[in-house]
């Protein structure tokens, strides 16, 4: 009986050891959207790994019935995580995180059904939020923001639609005061444009049409007095 138990334990140990092995990605092939081990007919289930030339792990993922399932990791050669994401039935789902070599968070990008959905956030290596990019159905859409990488203060914000600037865009002074406000249509300046002194007083204003100044452009001094007025047509001064 004792010998039988020992034999059974050895068999179980061997099976567990085999099951824990990671299949190297070089031995995998894709047929359609499914992963297979070369020469096998059944979609693969288990862990897959990719290594650096020195043998250290570069990437690690889990496959279920031929599709990515669960956490997917990419590593720097120093062993620290470079990126991590989550998959459900072969599609990215949830927040993908990317890291600097130091281990500090570099970005957070939300996914839904393999498409970017929501606000992606980007950070400096010092941990300061430097940009927020909104996505809808994998296309930039919404209010995008850029921050100063040293102070974290808002520098620029823009309305995005269909992947390009559509609507108001604003630039700010380091103090946080509004510097300019310009309107875009399909990524081309179109509509009113205003520029301000840091004290909030209007410095200049005009109108754009299809990317060209069109109409009366006016500049002011810091007391609100008109300094100059020039009329434009299709970007050219009308005299």
For each feature predicted by the language model, list its residue ranges.
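Positively charged n-region of N-terminal signal peptides that target proteins for export
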Residues: 1-4
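Bacterial N-terminal signal peptides
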Residues: 7-15
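Glycine/tyrosine- and acidic-biased, solvent-exposed loop/turn segments at the edges of beta-strands
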Residues: 15-239
């Amino acid at each position: 009986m004792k010998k039988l138990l020992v034999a059974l334990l050895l068999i179980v140990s061997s099976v567990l050891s085999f099951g824990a092995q990671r299949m190297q990605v070089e031995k995998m092939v894709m047929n359609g959207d499914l992963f297979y081990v070369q020469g096998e007919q059944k979609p693969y289930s288990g862990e897959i790994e990719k290594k650096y030339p020195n043998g250290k792990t570069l990437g690690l993922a889990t496959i279920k019935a031929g599709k990515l399932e669960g956490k997917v990791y990419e590593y720097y050669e120093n062993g620290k995580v470079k990126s991590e994401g989550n998959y459900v039935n072969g599609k990215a789902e949830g927040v993908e995180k990317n890291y600097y070599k130091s281990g500090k968070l570099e970005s957070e990008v939300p996914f839904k059904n393999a498409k970017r959905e929501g606000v992606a956030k980007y950070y400096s290596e010092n941990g300061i939020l430097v940009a927020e990019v909104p996505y809808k159905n994998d296309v930039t859409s919404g209010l995008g923001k850029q921050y100063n990488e040293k102070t974290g203060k808002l520098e620029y914000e823009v309305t995005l639609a269909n992947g390009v600037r559509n609507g108001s865009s604003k630039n700010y002074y380091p103090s946080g005061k509004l510097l300019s406000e310009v309107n875009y249509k399909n990524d081309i300046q179109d509509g009113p444009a205003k520029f301000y002194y840091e004290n909030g007083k209007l410095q200049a204003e005009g109108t754009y049409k299809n990317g060209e100044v069109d109409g009366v452009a006016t500049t002011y001094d810091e007391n609100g007095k008109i300094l100059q007025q020039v009329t434009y047509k299709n970007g050219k001064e009308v005299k």
